[in-house]
Amino acid sequence: SVTITSYDVSSVKKDDAIAALLPESVTKDGKLTIGTNPSYAPAEFLDADGKTQIGYDMDLARAMGNIFGLDTEIVSSNFDTIIPAIGSKYDLGIAAFTITKERMESVDFVSYFTAGMGYAVAAGNPKNVDENDLCGLNVAVETGTVEEEAINKTAKQCKADGKKDITIQSSKQQTDATTAVVTGKADVFFADSPVVGYAIAQTDGQLEQLGKDFDEVPNAIAIKKGDSQTTEAVQKAMQKLMDD
C-alpha cells in the first residue's frame, strides 16, 4: 500500500514580521486553532493511532503555526460545520476547501493549490458506470462538498430528462463514501482528484478511476470574513513556505 509521509515542519521557524500582522483575537490564547475533517486523505486523515491528524493540509497548518509563533491546535469536526464556526471556534479552516461563491459569502479565502474532481468505481467497472450518464445509479459523496452540490444538480437533470433517479448517498466522512463503493453499496464515488487517487492506492486494487480528472479549482484556507489582518498574515506565511 502507498503511505504518504508527512513532512517534518520543526525546521519552520517564527517570522516576527509575519506574526506581528495577526490580530489579538487570534494570538491572545497562544494557539492557532484549526478546524478540519480528518476523513479526506491524503489532505487530512488520522494516523494509525486513530488520534493524530496527518496529511498535507495538517503539515501546512502546523508550519503556519510555527511561522506565527503559536501552538497549532487542530480540531476535528464534521466538514459542513467548519465554515460556520470560523472566527468563533476556529481561527482558520483547513480542510481541502474549494472556493465557491456560496462559501465566499461566509468566509475569506487564501488559496494554496489546485485540485480537480474525479470518480472512482469498483475495479473492472463491473456495473459499466459511464461518467457521462449517472442517472439510475447510487452515487456516494461526502456531505457539504462541492461534489455533493454537483451531483444534486446532475440528479435534477436526470429527473428533468425523464431518466431514472440518482440515489445520492451522502456521508459525514469521505472514508464511508469510499467503503460504500468497495462493498458494492454504491456504484461510484465522487471526490477531489487527490482523494480519488489516494483511495485507489489504499484499497489495493479494489477501486479504479473512472474517466479523467476535471474542473480544476483552487483549494483554499478559510478565514473569518472581513478579517484582513489574518488574511494578510496567512498569505505572507503561504508565500514564505512556498519560497523556502
Description of each model-found segment:
Residues 2-16, 66, 125, 137-138, ...:
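Extended ligand-binding regions for polar small-molecule ligands
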Residues 2-93:
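Extracytoplasmic small-molecule ligand-binding "clamshell" domains
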Residues 3-24, 146-168, 205, 238-244:
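Ligand-binding clefts/hinges and TM-proximal coupling segments of bilobed small-molecule sensing domains
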Residues 38-41, 53-66, 97-99, 115-173, ...:
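Bilobed "Venus flytrap"/periplasmic-binding protein-like clamshell domains
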Residues 64, 85-87, 134, 181-182, ...:
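Hydrophobic residues within well-ordered alpha-helices
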Residues 71-133:
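Acidic, polar ligand-binding/catalytic clefts
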Residues 81, 97-104, 152-153, 182-216:
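A ligand-binding cleft/hinge motif common to bilobed small-molecule-binding domains
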Residues 113-121, 197, 201-239:
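Periplasmic-binding protein-like
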